[in-house]
């Protein structure tokens, strides 16, 4: 993967109240979902990425640790962090169930209807799998 050479402040990264390590984690997951990062691709070293985007090395390390725990990255002492997608679908579905439970509870508290949630999910799903945007759709096996 080639990282944007501009500083993080110029790319729009890290413009929210969410913890920086979670924002970095989310950007990497989005990169995987959109095929900008692929299984087997190395990630920059902790030091390189921290220097490049202008954040603390511990923040990058924490993001990589979370990605490893979630089955997106393997860390090898010689190769560094490498994208390695864990194919345990049942564990992924269980994790998704937990995360969506909180999201749906928030939506319910804000009077967002089931139909509106479904429309939003369809819209987001199409952002990742729409042929006109990213070429051929990913396999949905």
Task: Name every feature range the model reports, one short phrase each.
Residues 1-42, 48, 94-95, 104-141:
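Extreme N-terminal segment that seeds HTH/winged-HTH DNA-binding domains in transcriptional regulators
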Residues 42-74:
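N-terminal helix-turn-helix
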């Amino acid at each position: 993967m080639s990282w944007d050479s501009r500083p993080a402040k110029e790319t729009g990264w890290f413009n929210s109240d969410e913890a920086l390590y979670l924002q970095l984690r989310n950007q990497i997951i989005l990169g995987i979902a959109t095929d900008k990062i692929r299984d087997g691709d190395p990630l920059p070293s902790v030091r390189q990425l921290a220097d490049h985007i202008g954040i603390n090395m511990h923040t990058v390390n924490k993001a990589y640790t979370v990605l490893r725990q979630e089955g997106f990255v393997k860390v090898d002492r010689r190769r560094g962090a490498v994208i390695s997608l864990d194919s345990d679908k049942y564990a992924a579905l269980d994790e998704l169930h937990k995360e969506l439970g909180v999201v749906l509870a928030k939506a319910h508290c804000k009077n967002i209807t089931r139909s509106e949630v479904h429309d939003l999910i369809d819209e987001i799903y199409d952002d990742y799998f729409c042929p006109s945007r990213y070429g051929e759709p990913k396999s949905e096996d």
